[in-house]
Design a protein with these regions (language model features):
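Charged, well-structured alpha/beta interaction segments
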Residues: 17-19, 28-30, 49, 53-54
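Short hydrophobic alpha-helix segments
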Residues: 17, 25, 43-46, 57
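Beta-strand-rich domain onsets/edges
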Residues: 1-23, 31, 123
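Feature of secretome-associated and extracellular-like proteins
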Residues: 2, 65-129
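Beta-strand signatures of extracellular beta-sandwich domains
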Residues: 26-30, 67-69
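Short Pro-Gly-centered beta-turn/loop motif in secreted/extracellular proteins
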Residues: 54-64
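Short, acidic Ser/Thr/Gly-rich low-complexity loop/linker segments typical of extracellular
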Residues: 36-54
Length: 129
């Protein structure tokens, strides 16, 4: 039995176009145990009214890489966010970023908080605390 504890992950989303949390964004979590290993889907959740996703599944022991998939198209469609922007768009072409996939490395025993700052035409992500 290993004495190493597993890493853990949390996230939240802020919609920088309105200065508010992004509520109701579906997030999927996948992990792998090495750079050449296959991704294993672990499950997912959705952001709450504070933009937080508090119940992502635990990471399996031996996880070295994590992928968070943020399904942003439905959020932007619901908010009609792109229609409120001045940027030229092809009518009915859908969200410019229909999804955002973030992949990062983890080490056992550490917590990784990975916030997403999002707007209809850009995003930024960082390791939080």
């Amino acid at each position: 039995m290993s004495t190493q504890s597993t890493a853990s992950v949390s996230t939240h989303i802020l919609d920088t176009s309105i200065g508010r949390p992004a509520d109701g964004v579906t997030i999927s979590l996948a992990a792998r145990t090495g750079a050449d290993a296959q991704w294993v889907a672990l499950g997912g959740s959705a952001t709450d009214p504070d933009g937080r996703c508090k119940d992502l599944p635990a990471l399996p022991e031996g996880t070295t890489h994590v992928r968070l998939d943020f399904e942003t198209e439905q959020y932007f469609t619901k908010k009609q966010a792109e229609a409120q922007q001045d940027a030229p768009r092809v009518r009915d072409s859908g969200a410019f970023f229909p999804e955002v996939a973030i992949t990062f490395a983890v080490v056992p025993g550490e917590h990784f908080h990975v916030p997403l700052l999002l707007n209809p035409f850009g995003y930024s992500v960082y390791r939080g605390s």
